[in-house]
């Protein structure tokens, strides 16, 4: 039989949701949307770095970052 400790008693509420899941897809579509937005963000940064995305009037100088 497991021994009860103070630490275990303090951490027990954190584990009270164990095994409970939202039926169906839950928040998976929201996660997918954020993943796509993050991909677009990374692609824009890559294009700025490669100078394949040119923004008029904005000078991009990567030498000052190093």
From Swiss-Prot:
Sorted UniProt keywords: Membrane, Photosynthesis, Photosystem II, Thylakoid, Transmembrane, Transmembrane helix
GO molecular function list: phosphate ion binding
Pfam short name (any one): PsbH
Membrane association type: Single-pass membrane protein
Domain of life: Bacteria
Residue intervals passing through the bilayer: 29-49
SUPFAM superfamilies reported in the protein's UniProt record: Photosystem II 10 kDa phosphoprotein PsbH
Gene Ontology terms: cellular component: photosystem II; plasma membrane-derived thylakoid membrane
InterPro entries: PSII_PsbH, PSII_PsbH_sf
UniProt subcellular location: Cellular thylakoid membrane
GO annotation, biological process: photosynthesis; protein stabilization
NCBIfam families (UniProt xref): PRK02624.1
Subunit structure, as described in the record: PSII is composed of 1 copy each of membrane proteins PsbA, PsbB, PsbC, PsbD, PsbE, PsbF, PsbH, PsbI, PsbJ, PsbK, PsbL, PsbM, PsbT, PsbX, PsbY, PsbZ, Psb30/Ycf12, peripheral proteins PsbO, CyanoQ (PsbQ), PsbU, PsbV and a large number of cofactors. It forms dimeric complexes.
Reported function: One of the components of the core complex of photosystem II (PSII), required for its stability and/or assembly. PSII is a light-driven water:plastoquinone oxidoreductase that uses light energy to abstract electrons from H(2)O, generating O(2) and a proton gradient subsequently used for ATP formation. It consists of a core antenna complex that captures photons, and an electron transfer chain that converts photonic excitation into a charge separation.
Family per record: Belongs to the PsbH family.
Listed PANTHER family: PHOTOSYSTEM II REACTION CENTER PROTEIN H
Protein name: Photosystem II reaction center protein H
Source organism: Synechococcus sp. (strain CC9902)
């Amino acid at each position: 039989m497991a021994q009860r400790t103070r630490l275990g008693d303090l951490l027990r509420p954190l584990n009270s949701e164990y095994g409970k899941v939202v039926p169906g897809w839950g928040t998976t579509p929201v996660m997918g949307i954020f993943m796509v937005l993050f991909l677009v963000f990374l692609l824009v940064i890559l294009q700025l770095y490669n100078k394949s995305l040119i923004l008029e009037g904005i000078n991009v100088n990567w030498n000052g970052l190093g």
